[in-house]
């Protein structure tokens, strides 16, 4: 009844109730926002079926992007572990002298302990506690870092290390890479917690090199530009990610509005590598 009271057209009450049992009303109500007028009422002739399809589009879109971020995250782990292990040794990350002046080593060690405690039942953790007195090489401990922790770890390295990683691995500046890691941490968290991407404005506007296409809004498109720059395999980005992204958009193109995810008309050309 709440759906009908707002003016949405419900063609099948049974299907509507069934859907609401899967997606609770509070979560679903956020998808009403694009159809709300300034006075709080809603536009006429909007079907509940369209709301459902936008909801499903958002869900599938999160799936595509989450898989993409996972690929980026695994690559970042590998690169940070290899670099720091090569330059500072397997346990060098425990030495506060390798970090910059903003680094809070006590906080960092507490975060490491949290990582270990949260994974205390892992065979890897048990093995290193029993055999190596709880000393974890960088390439082991980093596997338990969250995306936010990886971003924090990079931001606290010495400037020379930051520059090398940004330039040699990601072909960008330190400022851009720091910004990008913060952005994908936020995006990853939204995807992981089933949060809405459609008609959503992100807090951070990613920093882009001067020669690049700069995002003009805080919608999803600006975040996907970041994924494009960080994705480790150019060929796979075009053949897999872009194919999946286009398929989801084409499936729901009659119900969604690209402007609500910040996509320009030439979005495919801008995102292709």
Model-predicted segments: where are they?
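Extended intrinsically disordered or low-complexity regions, especially N/C-terminal cytosolic tails and loops
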Residues: 1-186, 198-273
């Amino acid at each position: 009844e709440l759906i009908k009271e707002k003016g949405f057209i419900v063609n099948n009450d049974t299907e509507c109730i069934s859907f609401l049992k899967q997606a609770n009303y509070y979560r679903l109500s956020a998808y009403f926002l694009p159809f709300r007028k300034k006075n709080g009422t809603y536009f006429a002739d909007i079907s509940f079926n369209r709301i459902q399809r936008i909801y499903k589009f958002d869900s599938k879109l999160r799936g595509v992007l989450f898989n993409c971020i996972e690929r980026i995250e695994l690559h970042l782990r590998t690169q940070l572990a290899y670099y720091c292990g090569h330059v500072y040794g397997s346990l060098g990350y425990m030495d506060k002298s390798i970090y910059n002046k903003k680094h809070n080593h006590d906080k960092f060690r507490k975060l490491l302990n949290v990582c270990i405690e949260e994974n205390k039942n892992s065979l890897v953790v048990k093995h290193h506690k029993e055999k190596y007195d709880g000393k974890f090489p960088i390439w082991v401990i980093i596997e338990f870092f969250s995306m936010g922790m990886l971003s924090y770890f990079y931001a606290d390295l010495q400037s020379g290390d930051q520059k090398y990683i940004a330039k040699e691995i990601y072909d960008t500046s330190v400022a851009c890479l720091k910004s990008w890691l913060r952005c994908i941490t936020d995006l990853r968290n939204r995807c992981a917690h089933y949060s809405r991407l459609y008609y959503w404005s992100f807090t951070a506007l990613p920093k882009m090199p001067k020669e690049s296409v700069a995002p003009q809004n805080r919608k999803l498109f600006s975040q996907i530009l970041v994924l494009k720059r960080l994705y480790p395999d150019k060929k796979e980005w075009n053949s897999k990610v872009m194919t999946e992204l286009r398929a989801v958009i084409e499936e729901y193109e009659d119900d969604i509005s690209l402007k609500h995810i910040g996509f320009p008309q030439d979005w495919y050309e801008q995102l292709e590598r």
